[in-house]
């Protein structure tokens, strides 16, 4: 049968092969056509790097399938991997290495099984089948290694109704992961969940470790109500601003919306409702602020008075 091999330069090579051909055989055919030594060739299909001893049939490569040819650069490059203990490991890699390959190298050096490793670069968790090049990881880049702890830890999630949910998590779980676990238990879609810890709303891409959330910590779950509501903010000049908000918005969120509309920095804003100054980490629901409520905005003058 015929298969195609596409190079990084965009050139496509046509090869005559059989399903029973091994990856070694295919690399030899590429060498015959293109003069590239097999030890400099890496073949990728469906996002997987193909191993020399396996056959095309093993990978379900059929007629007119397209393989991608990536060259192993002689000499490769060095990258660094920093662990939570602060130790830095140096690895010899190539841009075409997959994240699996990198985890295997870390295992060789440190003895940590790949299934206990999570690698983070530029705030993103790296997926096994992708390559360093896919993530634009270049020479002397630093990856962060977070360990998946066996057995993990328990945390609690308290809802506004007072119900407490217990979750099994790991420090390396992202907030998205936690919301997915809450959905599994309670059926609440992640896009309706807001999680608060220590007065801060937690961002989806960050991990529990990023927020220093440890075993038996309690998170607060606030629901984003679909459609939200309008409230009014009255300034000392008598001007009234209308804002689109949700009960689960924190006072910080409201100040940010006021900044968007009026250009007043949040640190110069004080919001008053029912004679009380509102605290940043709390939500509108905490203060029983409902649709069409009016807040009063007082400016903090720089330097105080």
Swiss-Prot record:
What the entry lists under InterPro entries is as follows: Ubiquitin-like_dom, Ubiquitin-like_domsf, Ubiquitin_CS, Ubiquitin_dom, Ubiquitin_ubiquitin-like
**What molecular functions are annotated in GO for this chain?**
mRNA binding
Taxonomically, the superkingdom here is Eukaryota
What UniProt keywords apply to this chain's record, in alphabetical order?
Cytoplasm, Isopeptide bond, Nucleus, Repeat, Ubl conjugation
Pfam families, A to Z: ubiquitin
Q: Where in the cell is it found?
A: Cytoplasm; Nucleus
Q: Cross-link named Glycyl lysine isopeptide (Lys-Gly) (interchain with G-Cter in ubiquitin), where?
A: 48
Q: Name one GO cellular component term.
A: nucleus
Residue ranges the record assigns to the propeptide: 305
Q: Where exactly is the Glycyl lysine isopeptide (Gly-Lys) (interchain with K-? in acceptor proteins) cross-link placed along the chain?
A: 76
Annotated Ubiquitin-like domain residues: 1-76, 77-152, 153-228, 229-304
Q: Which PANTHER family match?
A: UBIQUITIN (PTHR10666)
Q: Which family does it belong to?
A: Belongs to the ubiquitin family.
A further note on this protein reads: For the sake of clarity sequence features are annotated only for the first chain, and are not repeated for each of the following chains.
Q: What does this protein do?
A: Ubiquitin exists either covalently attached to another protein, or free (unanchored). When covalently bound, it is conjugated to target proteins via an isopeptide bond either as a monomer (monoubiquitin), a polymer linked via different Lys residues of the ubiquitin (polyubiquitin chains) or a linear polymer linked via the initiator Met of the ubiquitin (linear polyubiquitin chains). Polyubiquitin chains, when attached to a target protein, have different functions depending on the Lys residue of the ubiquitin that is linked: Lys-48-linked is involved in protein degradation via the proteasome.
Protein name in the entry = Polyubiquitin
Which organism does this record belong to? Avena fatua (Wild oats)
């Amino acid at each position: 049968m015929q298969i195609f091999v596409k190079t990084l330069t965009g050139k496509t090579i046509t090869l005559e092969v059989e399903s029973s051909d091994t990856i070694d055989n295919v690399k030899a055919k590429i060498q015959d056509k293109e003069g590239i030594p097999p030890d400099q060739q890496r073949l990728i299909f469906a996002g997987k790097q193909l191993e020399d001893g396996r056959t095309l049939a093993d990978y379900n490569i059929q007629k007119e399938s397209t393989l991608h040819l990536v060259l192993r650069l002689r000499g490769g490059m060095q990258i660094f991997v920093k662990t939570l203990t602060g130790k830095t490991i140096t690895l010899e890699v190539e841009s075409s290495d997959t994240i699996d390959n990198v985890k295997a190298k870390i295992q060789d050096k440190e003895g940590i099984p790949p299934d206990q490793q999570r690698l983070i670069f530029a705030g993103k968790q790296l997926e096994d089948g992708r390559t360093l090049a896919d993530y634009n990881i270049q020479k002397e880049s630093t990856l962060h290694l977070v360990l998946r702890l066996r057995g993990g830890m328990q945390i609690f999630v308290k809802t506004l109704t007072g119900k407490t949910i217990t979750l099994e998590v790991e420090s390396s779980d992202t907030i998205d992961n936690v919301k997915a676990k809450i959905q599994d238990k309670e059926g609440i879609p992640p896009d309706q969940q807001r999680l608060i810890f220590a007065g801060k709303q937690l961002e989806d891409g960050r991990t529990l470790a990023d927020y220093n959330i440890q075993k038996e910590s309690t998170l607060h779950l606030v629901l984003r109500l679909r459609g939200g509501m309008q409230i009014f903010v009255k300034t000392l000049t008598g001007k009234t601003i209308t804002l689109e908000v949700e009960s689960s918005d924190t006072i910080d969120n409201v100040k940010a919306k006021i900044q968007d509309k009026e250009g007043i920095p949040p640190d110069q804003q004080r919001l008053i409702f029912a004679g009380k100054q509102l605290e940043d980490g709390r939500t509108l629901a905490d203060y029983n602020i409902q649709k069409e409520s009016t807040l009063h905005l007082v400016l903090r003058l720089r330097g105080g008075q």
